[in-house]
Amino acid sequence: MNGNKLVFLPKKSYHQLFNITFSAMMLALAIITSLISEFISIPFFSQLKLTFDISVVFLVACAFFVSLGWSLTITLASALTSFFWNTNNVIGVLTVTLANLSTILFTRLYFCLFSKRRFCWIFVFLFTTLSNALLLTTLNGILITPLFWYYFGYVQTPNFLIVAEQYNKNTDFHFFFFGINNYWLGIFCLYSFFNLVKFGLVSCFGVPIMRSFQKFYWKRALAK
């Protein structure tokens, strides 16, 4: 092992059993965690269909200790499974899936940058949290919130420019964003706070989990 540099499993036949077993285990844990999060009701956020789902931690583990391909596969499998208990919240499932994919890619990117640092995983998850908060807050303003409101019939168009204009004029919408009367300020305040808290929780679980997996599975991940 060279410092904190992670060596991925080589694509050899005798590693296939480990790949399948570990991926299946991570998928099962991700599904269970995602399901549990649906029963955790937090005032205000639950009314907006926002859940603090931290199942992505296990998808990230698969990306590092098996492969990116396997991780993307179980991410899609987890998303499809979520439709069983989220049949009326298609946009919510797609949003969580998008957040999971961005988390996987950001952790891979920042691991390449910080792999030689002493507290590697802390830096990886810290910058992933900040990047996700910025990306998803922006997407919520431009795409996700307009689609969500259009899907449930709150607005007549998913065009974010028109939605922002209607929000600013109609005080009935202000409930969604802490009573703030400006669409973009409301988007920033709500979703930056939500995403920082959510991915902060992901980091709190992700750092010790990744360090534990790194410790106990390292020998199996070394390419000899």
Swiss-Prot record:
Principal cellular location given in the protein's record: membrane
TM region(s), chain numbering: 25-45, 54-74, 91-111, 119-139, 142-162, 174-194
Keyword Membrane belongs to the record: yes
Membrane topology (UniProt): Multi-pass membrane protein
Keyword Lyase: no
Subcellular location, record wording: Cell membrane
Cellular-component GO terms for this entry: plasma membrane
UniProt entry keywords in alphabetical sequence: Cell membrane, Membrane, Transmembrane, Transmembrane helix
NCBIfam families given in the database record: memb_MPN527
Protein name, entry field: Uncharacterized protein MG350.1
Organism phylogeny: Bacteria, Bacillati, Mycoplasmatota, Mycoplasmoidales, Mycoplasmoidaceae
